[in-house]
From Swiss-Prot:
InterPro entries: Cytidylate_kin, Cytidylate_kinase_dom, P-loop_NTPase. This is Cytidylate kinase. SUPFAM superfamilies: P-loop containing nucleoside triphosphate hydrolases. It holds the Pfam family Cytidylate_kin. ATP binds at residues 11-19. Belongs to the cytidylate kinase family. Type 1 subfamily. Its main location: cytoplasm. GO terms for molecular function: ATP binding; CMP kinase activity; dCMP kinase activity. It is found in: Cytoplasm. It catalyses: CMP + ATP = CDP + ADP; dCMP + ATP = dCDP + ADP. Keywords: ATP-binding, Cytoplasm, Kinase, Nucleotide-binding, Transferase. GO terms for biological process: nucleobase-containing small molecule interconversion; pyrimidine nucleotide metabolic process.
Length: 230
């Protein structure tokens, strides 16, 4: 890697962002930053402390007093809150159903964006989320926007949950994903929208390997056009 390159991957829930972002980061030797995991970690901590996720001031207090870390490990990225590994807990249904309420608070997003930008300082990163290309890393060299049908996304999340031993109901997942899309797309601060210069990839009928290859091609194309090496 000769020069710093940032890759922003955005899209709705269960569009395949995290899976493909991790693969690309591993292949290129970049740092992977899962911004969604940061919001989930905060949501988990709020629930642990008996705080209503809709109470912005209380959730902000928890955030300002919590150390949320994304640590790289042999078995992938691990998520820690105050030195406690919560990588599995943040994927449970109670967190999934509440994270949108936490993520829509303006003060929470402002603080999270600041933390995420610091993680990308002077590093080559692949960062995924919902507002990376528009707000967190607006100057990212490569911006990707992944989409997929609600049915396909629910199926993927269901299969993922089953593999992890997490209770899962595909009908409920469809509703949760549709509701999440509505909240994410219509919130006042950093809504889920495609950046003007982002490349859209519909992953509905594509394998993860095919999605990965498409994104890698865009990264290599950028490198060739700008004389940057990976």
């Amino acid at each position: 890697m000769e020069q710093r390159i940032t890759v922003a991957i955005d899209g709705p829930a269960a569009a395949g962002k995290s899976t493909v972002a991790k693969m690309i980061a591993n292949q290129l030797g970049f740092i992977y930053v899962d911004t969604g995991a940061m919001y989930r970690a905060l949501t988990y901590q709020a629930l642990q402390e008996g705080i209503d996720p809709k109470n912005e001031d209380s959730v902000l207090t928890i955030l300002m007093n919590s150390n949320i870390e994304l640590r790289q490990a042999e078995n992938g990225q691990r998520v820690f809150v105050n030195n406690k590994d919560v990588s599995e807990e943040i994927r449970y249904p109670d967190v999934t159903s509440k994270v949108s309420f936490v993520a829509e608070h303006p003060s929470i997003r402002k603080e999270m964006v600041s933390r995420q930008q610091k993680l990308a300082n002077n590093r080559s990163v692949v960062m995924d989320g919902r507002d990376i290309g528009t707000h967190v890393l607006p100057d990212a060299e490569v911006k990707i926007f992944l989409i997929a049908s609600v049915e396909e996304r629910a199926k993927r999340r269901h299969e993922e949950n089953i593999k992890k031993g997490i209770p899962s109901d595909i009908k409920l997942l469809k509703k949760e994903i549709s509701d999440r899309d509505e909240i994410d797309s219509n919130r006042e601060v950093s809504p889920l929208i495609k950046a003007e210069d982002a490349i859209e990839v519909d992953t509905t009928s594509l394998s993860i390997a095919e999605v990965k290859d498409q994104i890698l091609n865009e990264i290599f194309k950028y490198n060739t056009q700008n004389n940057k090496g990976v």
